Amino acid sequence: MKIVINAASAKMGGAVTYITNVLRCLPGPESEYEFEVFLPPETASEQVGLARNVHLLVTNIGHASWWKRLWWEQITLRSHLRKTAAALLYSTGNFGMFRCPVREVLLVCNALYFSKVYREGFVPRHNWRMRVAFRLRRWLVRRSAESCDVVMTPTQALLDDLRPAVKVDLHKALVNPYGVAEEGFSPQPVEGATPAPGEGCGPVVRLVYVSLYAEHKNLATLLEAIRLLNRDGGRKFLLKTTVNPAWKDAAWTTTYRDDLALAGQPGVAPWVEFVGPFDRAEALRLYRGADIFVFPSLVESFGHPLAEAMAAGLPIAAADTPVNREVCGSAAEYFEPFSPEDLASKVTRLASDRALRQRLGLAGSRRAAAAPGWDAHVRRVLEAAKLGAAS
């Protein structure tokens, strides 16, 4: 059974994390499957140790203009499916093929298109070209979801946001949580003077926030909270984050200038270090060097960093959103998303209460260990390929 996986737009961030883990878990040549995977060159070069029946097809179409990508996905890829006698198309990047000639499973994984917070709070601040492009992409996702055989989301929260905008029958909708990459992320044992993550908060508390910069990542709320946390002469809070408004790909956002200015203010700059973007090994060191993980992001489809922080045994302070609660459950303290005061209060509580930190860290470790792994995620994709969305 030949399965074509379209991940041609998986260039960075969660898209790369996703496809990398999926490819590593695809069944080998002893199975009935053969896989052809479209990937951009920079992502393809990072894939090692794949099964012999996984064939990478490198393409630069993910870097092309939207209309060229649309032509490729609707015309060029359609021709490839017919010529290669593929049995299934797995579209991993929100956009699918209209009237696909074979069975299609579509992963909707960009929550921005269906987030009321993003549509009302950020889209109107963009120029007319960006607003038109957003509406067009949202329409394409809706049309793709209506056209495919199975619609898959990583969280129930995203499916709940999708349903008011798209007519998705119950029999074709599937919530398939992402796995948790546990290798190397398990909590470190206490040895000598080396504390496990979340323990030993003393005069300096180490905070970490891992993600790529975007306007919905809500960096301003965190920076304002850092100012509040460090305004007296007591305990100091140091933030290390990869959410960098000076990142080369941040210029499209409407918030990066304000965030850069805020980060440079005297009450903020001494306590914030921008780092990365990081590869997996560097990110692991970042988690291990932290006391508390903070996650103010307003919109997520799943939140890979939350899963990684739980696997690392870190106590978490997260924005109170449906998806964050779905992923973390009782393993986090939640704050009002736009309230620096509430965020600062929750972080102060965590820093002052060792028992609470340990309880949240243990709850996160157990939750990550009990969560379905990437093998289970891939298995459900393959089941959907043959049986539909019945779970």
Specify the residue positions occupied by each region the protein language model found.
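Short alpha-helical donor nucleotide-sugar binding micro-motif in glycosyltransferases
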Residues: L81, R285-A290
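Aromatic "clamp/platform" in nucleotide-sugar-dependent glycosyltransferases that forms part
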Residues: L298
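Nucleotide-activated donor-binding/catalytic signature segment of Leloir-type glycosyltransferases, i.e.
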Residues: R52-H55, V243-P245, T253-A281
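Short hydrophobic beta-strand element within catalytic cores of glycosyltransferases
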Residues: L306, A311, P315-A318
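Conserved donor-binding/catalytic core segment of Leloir-type glycosyltransferases
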Residues: V4, E199-K217, L223-I226, K240
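Carbohydrate-associated surface elements
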Residues: A157, G179
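Conserved acidic donor-binding segment of nucleotide-sugar-dependent glycosyltransferases
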Residues: E333-P340, R349-R354
